[in-house]
Design a protein with these regions (language model features):
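Serine-dependent carboxylesterase/thioesterase catalytic core
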Residues: 6-10, 17, 27, 33-46, ...
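C-terminal catalytic-base region of ester-bond hydrolases, centering on the histidine
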Residues: 14, 142-205
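Hydrophobic alpha-helical membrane-insertion segments
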Residues: 19-20, 48, 111, 161-164, ...
Length: 205
């Protein structure tokens, strides 16, 4: 069965170069896999997440058309951008699998005192932010998607670490210590690749 394209969404203060190790691992195991890692400039967190999700919608439509099915992976803030695209831009209709890694789906205390007028994108990740509340109210849109959340309990960027989970799907702690290690440590890379390349029926449990 042909694999769907896999879209990789980077987080705050990062670029698609962040995924070099993961991309290498994925392509070594599955050379025919189509990977797409768009650059979403956050301007140090000043750009609201909804604006970034709208940019993502334009980029995905330009790359794949408006209906081509795909899989989605989001690291950190990228996971919240991806979820916003899924739930507010109709992405749920074309997405088979959604995997988030160290992503503040339930907010993070690290963003709690950030002023929204200066850093709206970071403020969107506050615990109880308007964006996260609205996404939770429409969480049923994720029901048809194979959802998975990976996190580390010792994360101090998404703090507390257990808040880095979607309201649907499986949840698994990754045996690394820091937020950054989630996307660069060999153990984490191997685990993420296992999940992204697994068959849907195998990954769901």
């Amino acid at each position: 069965m042909p694999r769907l394209p896999l879209v990789l969404l980077h987080g705050l203060w990062d670029t698609p170069r962040l995924f070099a190790r993961l991309e290498s691992e994925l392509l070594e195991r599955c050379p025919q896999l189509e990977l797409y890692a768009p650059h979403l400039p956050h301007r140090l967190g000043a750009v609201p997440i909804r604006e970034l999700a709208a940019q993502l919608a334009v980029l995905l439509d330009a790359r794949f058309g408006s209906t081509h099915p795909l899989d989605l992976f989001g690291f950190s803030m990228g996971g919240v951008i991806g979820r916003t695209w899924l739930q507010e831009h109709g992405g749920h209709r074309r997405t088979s699998r959604f995997v988030v890694l160290g992503s503040p789906q339930r907010g993070t205390l690290a963003a709690q005192w950030v002023p929204r007028p200066l850093l709206a994108g970071i403020a969107d990740m506050k615990i109880g932010s308007a964006l996260l509340r609205q996404l939770d109210r429409r969480a049923h849109l994720l029901e048809s998607i194979d959802c998975h959340s990976l996190y580390t309990p010792t994360d101090i960027t998404v703090f507390p670490g257990w808040r880095a989970v979607l309201p649907r799907g499986t949840r698994r702690a990754v045996p690394v210590l820091t937020h950054r290690q989630l996307i660069v440590h060999p153990r984490a890379i191997s685990l993420v690749a296992d999940l992204l390349l697994s068959e849907r029926s195998t990954a769901m449990n």
